[in-house]
Amino acid sequence: MHTEHTRDRTERLLADLVRIDSTNPALGGDGHGAGEREIAAYVADVMHDIGLDVDHWEPAPGRPNVVGILPGAGDGRSLMWNAHMDTVGVEGMDAPFEPTRKHGRLYGRGAQDMKGSLAAQLVAAQNLKASDVPLAGDLLVAAVADEEHKSIGTEALVDRYDVDGAIVTEPTDLQLVRAHKGFVWIDVQTHGRAAHGSRPAEGIDANMHMGRVLSRLEELGRSLSGRQGHALVGPPSLHAGQLRGGSAPSVYAAECRLRMERRTVPGESAEEVLAEVRGILDELSDADEAFEAEAEIAFAREPLDTPADAPIAAATRKGLAHVLDDEPAPDTGASFWTDAALLAEAGTDTVVLGPEGAGLHTTDEWVDLDSVAHLAEVLAHTARRYCVEQAS
């Protein structure tokens, strides 16, 4: 159970955070998102007031990270809590930065994704700082930029800090997530020959050729859904995200471009996924000498797969059981991607745990206020269990 004092502080802090426009510049429409400067300054002030050592820097111009450090009293494990400060855009929302409380929920842009989590991290750090029992290992409270676009914040974070364990506090309905999918964006281009629509003997239609590719990708998608998949995240998937081809109705298309997304599961690599797509193109080319196409990776992120017996997973389970006064739900997986994968790639045992809510990336976003307070208590209890002296 959370204390009313924790509930009051997380609610007030969350409301303050929602009032600050931190729309990602890449997602605010015409590149006009406010970015993280104002919210980072606010978070840094809160960290200073708590008594943390504050590291405030910009991985890219105008895109700050803030890390508050509670130094450990010994040689215990180091722990990081990670939340992003940026949000998606606000199109269609009437008052996105006016926090509204209703039926135990707080509504507003970023309430669930993920300012509720950021508020919980700060209150948990405050509780630990005020405790008479210091942690044996360092605690790092990270507020990062740009998760909603290219994750430059956490990429810079893992270059700057090396920690033993991490909890990324993306919303999970207070369920422990230790695996999630990755993704690969692949650009496919088919080539044709431009000609007037009245001269079919001279034209080669790149759009029609892309149609063959799409048909084969649809078959592949059905095959992927039938695979056994990963125990926590299920099977992989794919979809055709963006398609562009041709210059005019009366002209044979000289080229057609597809950007597809392939959701990967632990054990799959981006290179394997690319080879799968290139294999389709090779088969189509073998069947028709006029067919010409290529595929390249545009962007990729790895999946997350933290072992069940990792110390950070065990400590988080204990924290959940203590705060909720019940055995936690079984560990689960997620179909979405988070910055946890970047921390794991850097060698940090990482899990994902966040509050309850709904409507992220929609016009009706909310977070459950009790769950935010619960998260703060779970984080603090987990830190006490995790940041202990390591066996020699």
Predicted regions and their residues:
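Metal-dependent amide/peptide-bond hydrolase catalytic core
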Residues: 1-5, 49, 58-60, 187-392
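Acidic/His- and Gly-rich active-site-bordering loop/insert found
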Residues: 2-109, 135, 145, 386
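Alpha-helical metal-binding/catalytic segments enriched in His/Glu/Asp
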Residues: 81, 101-148, 187-190, 201-221, ...
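Acidic-glycine-rich active-site phosphate/pyrophosphate-binding loop
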Residues: 86-102, 178-189, 318, 351
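Short glycine/proline-enriched loop/turn "hinge" motifs that connect secondary-structure elements
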Residues: 89-92, 133, 177-182, 249-253, ...
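Short beta-strand/turn micro-motifs at beta-sheet edges
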Residues: 97, 129, 174-178, 227-228, ...
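Acidic/histidine-rich catalytic neighborhood of metal-dependent amide-processing enzymes
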Residues: 114-185, 387, 391-392
